[in-house]
Amino acid sequence: MKQFTALLVLLALISCADDQWDDCVTSTGPNLTVEREASPFHTMELGSKIDVVLTQDSVDAITVEGGRNLLGQVETSISDGVLRINSNLTCNWVRNLHDRIKVHVHCSSLRTIVYTGSGDVTCTNAIVQPTFRVEQRQGSGTLRLNIEADTCWYGLHTGPGNVIASGTANVLYLYSNGYAHIDVLAQQHQQSHCNNSGSGDFRTAPSAVFYGAVYNAGDIHYYGDPIIGSLVDEGSGSVIHGD
């Protein structure tokens, strides 16, 4: 067994590229926070196992927090209004699971998140925009968002990454085709349009009108006493009033 374990370690180290060697054989180092260059952006594309903390602000700014020896493997770039955050770290399994990279993003006009990573996203205050959109594809972390917008779209296409939203909205569009859950009970809204084609559950409490469609194993729980715009129940899941 010891020989097998040693072989796995050796293969992992061999797989590390030259510019990732420190990632595989060195410690994270002391915690450090560094500023990164920033310019205005409207979309954030987040990959890898990186936690992001969002703050609505009048200026755009980015700081990266983590072990000094690993910060060079974290990429933050902005082009054509898109902020891209990724990591080249490959040997996280040899370190303490709590030693995670955190990126603090101050944003003035963020209105779209494209999420393909496994880190978590949180907000220190409300992100205020006319519209806001989340597109999750193979994401596996949790997005805890505080959004104030007229219209919000939460689209979870694949993967188990959940959305838990607070704030306010006039209209919400909820969609899932994966394993994820969507909980918008804390986001006050008037209309809720729900398409659950996945196996996770939705929770929504529109004050005016509810539209619900279930096509798979996931349930839709709706609360309050909204007008029912339409109901479709074609999966093994159900549309449920309350719990």
Region roles according to the model:
Residues 82-88:
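Short carbohydrate-recognition loop motifs
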Residues 61, 80-82:
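A generic structural signal for beta-strand entry/edge sites
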Residues 1-16:
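Sec-dependent bacterial lipoprotein signal peptides
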Residues 16-69, 88-106, 122-123, 237-243:
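Short acidic/polar N-terminal linker immediately downstream of export determinants
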Residues 42-54, 103-105, 110-243:
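Extended, compositionally simple hydrophobic/Ser/Thr-rich segments
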Residues 72:
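Active-site-flanking structural segment that lines cofactor/substrate pockets
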